[in-house]
A protein has these predicted regions:
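Ligand-binding pockets and gating/stacking loops
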Residues: 1-485
Length: 485
């Protein structure tokens, strides 16, 4: 049997000996093997179409160039934070006068109306009504657009999260961050285009479904980074490989990668993994600088709440989000711990703690972007996958009271990137249960977001198995023009 290799290839022994770089030269092959890509099953090829992260021009003039999503997993209570309902106070403790309550947790269900524990007041020139739990958000009321009429109708956390993140209620589909990155690429070569920051305690609930590329090419998957240093593990090479040795390694690996890619056109998983390792090399300096907030002035650190016990962690992540966008990252998402806003019980003590952790950093992010001239081109989003019910759950004493899921009417806010500041849009019924005026479903939400980036939601598509697939899932969707400046 002939041992002669195809033209242009060399044996492993010759590679090591001729290269003179030792076993470190096998790093890429080892990493690819660990990722299962060298022995991956054969997949349908995509032809010679090239998928990359080079910056791209939207087909229409666009105000938004980047987005920061502060995703509040669990479902913040709209009637306690954003949507005051005097009727709840009036009927507190009485039986809900209707029969259209849809519980997610029937075992702990109650028909007793639960009034809010907190007062509302007006803020800004616009007079936006916000809870006393959000005093800092009130300082930027004239810059945010509050939507009180969100609706998805999907009452389970996973499906509701998927609806808001991907436009579909099943897993395995691209998130909005992946779509935006696919459409526009990145403004930086030295940092990931799409970054997701988790909580110090680990991965979020439902993990990578928050940043999945789904069936889009793998290069558009989000990069998950740790909340605390080191934010990206294993970024530094051994001391013996730093400098010129590493440069020589990368030069040879690039040549080999190019030849391998030419023989495997359309294999996007392999191409994406190779590009991710090349990006890791460039990130060795850029990422450290971007994630290092020690150079920020004292007044900026204080603005975000860095050093405050109640909000230090979230303050640091919001500040890093600004620094990433400032350096050309296209899409950043900041996730909370688990489903911390899922207030089935102890809402009286849990909600103030959650608000104290997020209110100051969230408001500071808006104010800081505005001060730097970045808010006009950066969308800031604050919201979760659902809201809460107007009746109490866990009727075991006031300290135990909570609220069940509600996806038929909930609130979220957005700022910058073409959205109209100081606007309160939409209404729920007098109980805060159902959106009844100017309803915005998740398809409308995504269509409006894409419009801010310069795309028509039904024109930004990816062809798969003969179908032209879109973020809005080929469903009727409207761009909510009233939200836009």
């Amino acid at each position: 049997m002939s041992t002669k290799l195809p033209h242009g290839l060399c044996s492993r022994r010759h590679f090591i000996e001729a290269g003179g770089f030792g076993l470190g030269m096998l790093g890429l092959a080892t990493l690819l093997r660990q990722d299962g890509l060298l022995a991956a099953p054969i997949k349908p090829l995509l032809g010679n179409e090239v998928f990359d992260l080079l910056p791209k021009q939207a087909p229409r003039p666009a105000k938004a160039k980047a987005m920061i999503s502060l995703f509040m997993m669990g479902g913040p209570s709209q009637m306690d934070l954003f949507d005051p309902k005097p009727m709840l106070t009036k009927w507190h403790g009485q039986k809900f006068p209707g029969d259209n309550l849809k519980y997610d947790n029937v075992a702990q269900a109650s028909a007793k109306v639960l009034g809010s524990f907190w007062k509302f007041s007006r803020h800004g020139k616009c007079g936006m009504e916000l809870s006393e739990l959000l005093p800092q958000l009130g300082t930027v009321a004239d810059d945010i657009c509050l939507i009180r009429s969100m609706k998805s109708g999907v009452n389970n956390h996973l499906q509701a999260m998927l609806a808001m993140q991907t436009g579909r209620i099943t897993g395995g589909n691209p998130t909005m961050g992946a779509w935006v990155t696919y459409a526009l690429g990145s403004e930086t070569k030295d940092l990931p285009a799409y970054v997701v920051m988790g909580h110090p305690n680990g991965l979020p609930t439902f993990a990578n479904q928050h940043w999945s590329n789904g069936w889009l090419p793998s290069i558009y998957q989000g990069t998950f980074v740790r909340a605390t240093a080191p934010h990206i593990l294993n970024l530094d090479p051994p001391a013996s490989l730093q400098g010129k040795p590493q440069e020589r390694q990368m030069e040879l690996l690039r040549a080999m990668n190019a030849e391998h890619a030419a023989n495997h056109p359309g294999e996007t998983d392999l191409q994406a993994r190779i590009q991710s390792y090349e990006l890791a090399g460039r990130m060795q300096l850029a990422a450290k600088e971007a994630f290092d907030i020690s150079s920020e002035p004292k007044h900026v650190l204080e603005l975000y709440g860095v050093g405050r016990k109640e909000c230090d962690d979230y303050a640091r992540r919001c500040l890093i989000a600004r620094r990433l966008v400032e350096r050309g990252v296209r899409y950043v998402q900041v996730l909370n711990q688990g489903q911390s806003w899922d207030s089935h019980s102890v809402i009286k003590t849990a909600l103030p703690t959650l608000c104290a952790a997020t209110d100051r950093p969230s408001a500071a992010l808006v104010a800081d972007l505005k001060q730097r001239g970045l808010l006009d081109s950066t969308i800031v989003h604050w919201g979760g996958e659902m809201g809460r019910m107007p009746v109490l759950q866990n009727d075991a004493g006031e300290a135990k009271w909570g609220r069940d899921h509600n996806t038929y009417g909930f609130s979220q806010w957005v700022a910058g990137g073409g959205f109209k500041g100081g606007l309160t849009y939409g209404e729920t019924d007098e109980w805060g249960h159902h959106a009844v005026k100017d309803v915005v479903n998740h398809y409308d939400w995504h269509a409006t977001m894409l419009d801010c980036f310069g795309f028509e939601h039904d024109k930004l598509v990816y062809k798969r198995n003969g179908a032209a697939l879109a973020l809005t899932n080929n469903q009727p969707a409207r761009v909510v023009r009233e939200l836009l400046a």
